[in-house]
Amino acid sequence: MIVVFVGTAGSGKTTLTGEFGRYLEDNYKVAYVNLDTGVKELPYEPSIDVREFVTVEEIMREGYGPNGAIVESYDRLMEKFNEYLNKILRLEKENDYVLIDTPGQMETFLFHEFGVRLMENLPYPLVVYISDPEILKKPNDYCFVRFFALLIDLRLGATTIPALNKVDLLSEEEKERHRKYFEDIDYLTARLKLDPSMQGLMAYKMCSMMTEVLPPVRVLYLSAKTREGFEDLETLAYEHYCTCGDLT
């Protein structure tokens, strides 16, 4: 089974990858893949590490700025695309789980040919789109997260599950509020209708058609610190694999 973690910088993606892997290692054979050319340290031992071929730091010494170096690093990774793809496919055959950690600059993986082609060639990968509770301040934000998960699904051609990370930092009242907004579309739509702004109207219209365009997927509530939600993620990954990508 291949699980791909994507998320914005600071969402806790890499820490979650490592801790979920250690959780799985109690019962399964697990391999890790690091696709972040800019990361300094990892909380896991990768079987495949793109930094062995190229790093952002090395490219910046050539005169590139930080953003340009990230893009250039992925341009250079394309030279080794088939090699990395074949290595990952071998890992998938030799292990129960392959956990793929993507760049902290999420757009690098989503919009570069390397990420898209890789996902097109992997067998039934499950994408976990990780969000930080800090970005969820108003009803519009929940609408954004659900639709962005759909956009990732469309872009990568892989089932994408939205996940709220760092839930150990939330009170029970806050957790319940997040669940209400994520899981009760009627409630979210009603709240959005109260916002008279142009953004509120747009979010309301998008949310109103959510049941028509969004597949019925579950939202995960995770914590790398307490391992909350890990059993749910394990179950969902198993169901995804056994149904060949259909979680409906």
Curated annotation (Swiss-Prot):
Q: Does the keyword GTP-binding apply?
A: yes
Positions bound to GTP: 10-15, 165-168, 224
- Keyword Electron transport in record: no
Site entry: Stabilizes the phosphate intermediate? 67
For the protein in the UniProt heading, the enzyme class is hydrolase
Tell me which positions the record assigns to the signal sequence. Answer: none
SUPFAM superfamilies assigned: P-loop containing nucleoside triphosphate hydrolases
EC assignment: the record states 3.6.5.-
A Pfam match is ATP_bind_1
Return the InterPro entries for the record: Gpn (IPR004130), Gpn1/Npa3/XAB1 (IPR030230), P-loop_NTPase (IPR027417)
Gene3D superfamilies, per database record: P-loop containing nucleotide triphosphate hydrolases
Keywords attached to this entry: GTP-binding, Hydrolase, Nucleotide-binding
Q: Where does motif Gly-Pro-Asn (GPN)-loop map?
A: 65-67
Q: Which GO terms describe its molecular function?
A: GTP binding; GTPase activity
Known partners and oligomeric status: Homodimer. Interacts with DNA topoisomerase VI subunit B (top6B), DNA primase DnaG and RF-C.
Its job = Small GTPase that may be involved in genome maintenance. Has weak intrinsic GTPase activity but displays no ATPase activity.
The family this protein is said to belong to? Belongs to the GPN-loop GTPase family.
Protein name (record) = GPN-loop GTPase PAB0955
